[in-house]
Design a protein with these regions (language model features):
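Aromatic-residue detector
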Residues: 30-45, 98-99, 103, 145-146, ...
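Generic detector of bulky aromatic hydrophobic side chains
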Residues: 3-11, 178, 182-183, 203
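Contiguous N-terminal and early-domain "leader" segments and peripheral loops that mark the onset or edge
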Residues: 1-7, 188-189, 250, 260, ...
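Structural detector for internal amphipathic alpha-helices that build alpha-solenoid repeat scaffolds
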Residues: 49, 80-89, 109-123, 142-160, ...
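Amphipathic alpha-helical scaffolding segments comprising HEAT/armadillo-like alpha-solenoid repeats
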Residues: 89-102, 121-139, 162-172, 193-206, ...
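N-terminal alpha-helical scaffold/docking segments in eukaryotic complex subunits
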Residues: 1-138, 286-292
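Short inter-helical turns and helix N-cap capping residues of alpha-solenoid HEAT/ARM repeat scaffolds
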Residues: 107, 136-138, 146, 176-180, ...
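Extended alpha-helical scaffolding segments
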Residues: 12-50, 216-292
Length: 292
């Protein structure tokens, strides 16, 4: 039979089937029926069942017919990571690798048992957790953990409280997954002053790059702070910063921490200038209202 035209989502379904479910549609369908934590929101159960029917009519594996060599390489990499994670359970005394494997392979929505076990081990877990944050593999839902592992690692790191994790959490910012972004920022906030000091250096760093923006975004979630506010206000006096549509709104937000009447009056004068961007007027007025 001719293979019906398949779209990109169909090919992704095949890749996920092969990576996570041993190439078995039946196992994948059961997993989706039970709403497993790794179920992809873009994959409809009806479509998975349709692909199973197409394969049965064809009498050949759809992946073999349709997937590219790079796709097979990605699947093979995912399977290899699964094998490595499962291998550690053969070594009963390998406490740290076992705890990390438990965290990655968990099927719990909120794996509090696994997280608690890691936190109890303390600082010896910091480096393995940082590796999870730094590895691009574990952000990929095709790989073990379904892309959830960095979030769990961040929670563990802020509970353990070793500040060496701060630069790694910061470097993880700026991704497309907004849920992950929120968790990373929450972890940075949990570190308190050490994280704030680190972020301030990135906020004022030169030349201007994505680090400045990511620092501003993260600092907006901290309690208002006069030192941060003064730094942000100073940055707003640079025309390039003021006209940066991504950066400037966060700088204005941070200015809420200006506490002296003198600084607040200078801020008021800034937003009244004819050269002040119109698109930022409302943001500026919001800060003024917050001081009333």
């Amino acid at each position: 039979m001719d293979i019906p035209l398949l779209d990109e989502i169909d090919l992704e379904i095949l890749m996920h089937r092969d990576a996570h479910f041993g190439g078995n549609f039946g196992i994948m369908i059961e997993y989706y029926e039970n709403e497993g934590v790794g179920a992809m929101p873009d994959f409809e159960l009806d479509r998975i069942e349709e692909l199973q029917s197409i394969q049965e009519e064809l009498g050949e594996d759809l992946s073999t017919k349709l997937l590219s060599m790079p796709a097979f390489e990605e699947i093979a990499k995912s399977k290899a990571i699964y094998s490595q994670l499962e291998e550690v359970y053969k070594h009963k005394n390998a406490t740290i690798p076992i705890l990390i494997s438990d965290l990655i392979l968990t099927e719990e929505e909120e794996p509090m048992e696994e997280i608690t076990a890691i936190i109890k081990e303390g600082e010896k877990m910091v480096e393995p957790l940082i590796q999870l944050i730094d590895s691009s593999d574990f952000y990929n839902p095709l790989y073990p953990g379904y892309g959830r592992t960095p979030a769990f690692a961040a929670v563990c790191l802020d509970k353990i409280g070793d500040p060496k994790a701060i630069p790694h959490l910061f470097q993880a910012l700026g991704g497309e997954n907004l849920d992950l972004e929120e968790i990373f920022i929450s972890s940075l906030v949990a570190f308190g002053t050490p994280a704030k000091t680190f972020l301030l250096k990135r906020l004022i760093g030169k030349p201007l790059n994505k680090d400045n923006l990511n620092a501003a975004v993260a600092l907006a979630f901290f309690p208002t702070d006069e030192k941060i506010a003064k730094a942000a206000f100073k940055l707003l006096h640079d025309e390039d910063n003021l006209n940066n549509e991504s950066f400037a709104p966060y700088l204005i937000c941070l200015c809420e921490g200006l506490t002296t009447p003198e600084d607040q009056e200078l801020f008021k004068e800034l937003i009244k200038k004819p050269s002040f961007p119109k698109m930022l007027k409302l943001d500026g007025q919001t800060i003024l209202h917050s001081w009333q």
